[in-house]
């Protein structure tokens, strides 16, 4: 049904405990001016449905369209009318789908639910780490695992790097390539510059490719140290310890800065069997079963893993 009166009549007949409207922009009412999906229609229809839900103790889920930038399409007022706003997110090149709480009057708004897009449909993911890491039989140069936070949920992600000499023509003109996938390109370029100037790992005049495994998108600075270590490992052709995770923001002076949720991240790494964790100095992390390596500077981090 797409007419409000018919929807209400059906509610009266069925007396549901759960009501899902998909989507609110397609419902219309002859008693309200304007076209379906317009400001007046959406406001009045949503208000009427919310009123009925509260009067009859019905759990109401309103599905709304979103724009290309991910915001709720149509009138923004729809977000203000409801108690909880959940965004269903995902990249078409990745199997991971997220339900992220944007607004929550009854709890935390930084909670995230993880789901896997499979051939048989969407299934819940209790441990999404397997999508974004690879267990290598032998240590491989250019790989490093980090721990990122999706809301308050720690997820381990593998960063892979490849450093190679460009062709002769590119070398003559200094047109070395910098290609990233799943990472913030300007931030990665900054990390490469710091790696060369502060840790003496030469990457200028060489092609550098850095990517996340499984299509994971990482934008937080906490992955800087893992990016630097993976590139340094690839540049030197020396593998990092397979049981190592690295977290920390890299500053322009080469310092390793503290990050939020460090204890929670390392606890997740320990739970999944990692034995060493490289973290910013002063993080004061104590987790049973994992050795914590504190580093204050990038060159110190490079020395600890012996790729200098």
Each model region followed by its residue ranges:
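Conserved nucleic-acid-binding Ia/Ib motif block in the N-terminal RecA-like helicase ATPase lobe
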Residues: 1
């Amino acid at each position: 049904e797409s007419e409000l009166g018919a929807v209400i009549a059906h509610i009266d007949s069925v007396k549901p405990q759960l009501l899902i409207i998909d989507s609110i922009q397609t419902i219309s009412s002859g008693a309200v001016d304007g076209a379906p999906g317009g400001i007046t229609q959406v406001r009045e229809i949503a208000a009427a449905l919310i009123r009925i839900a509260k009067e009859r103790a019905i759990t109401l889920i309103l599905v709304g369209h979103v724009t290309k930038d991910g915001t709720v399409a149509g009138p923004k007022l729809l977000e203000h009318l409801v108690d909880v706003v959940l965004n269903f997110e995902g990249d078409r090149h990745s199997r991971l789908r997220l339900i992220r709480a944007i607004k929550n009057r009854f709890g935390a708004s930084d909670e995230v639910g993880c789901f896997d897009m499979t051939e048989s449909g969407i299934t819940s993911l209790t441990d999404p780490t397997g999508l974004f890491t690879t267990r290598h039989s032998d240590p491989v140069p250019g790989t490093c695992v980090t721990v990122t936070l999706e809301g308050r949920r720690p997820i381990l992600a593998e960063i892979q790097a490849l450093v190679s000499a460009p062709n002769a023509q590119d070398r003559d003109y200094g047109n070395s390539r910098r290609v990233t996938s799943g990472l913030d390109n300007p931030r990665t370029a900054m990390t490469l510059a710091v790696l060369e100037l502060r840790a003496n790992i030469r990457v200028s005049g060489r092609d550098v490719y850095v990517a996340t495994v499984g299509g994971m998108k990482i934008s937080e600075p906490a992955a800087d140290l893992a990016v630097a270590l993976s590139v340094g490992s690839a540049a030197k052709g020396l593998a990092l310890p397979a049981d190592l995770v690295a977290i920390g923001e890299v500053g322009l002076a080469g310092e390793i800065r503290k990050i939020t949720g460090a204890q929670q991240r390392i606890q997740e790494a320990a739970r999944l069997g990692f034995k060493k964790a490289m973290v910013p100095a002063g993080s004061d992390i104590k987790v049973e079963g994992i050795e914590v390596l504190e580093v204050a500077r990038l060159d110190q981090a490079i020395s600890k893993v012996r790729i200098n």
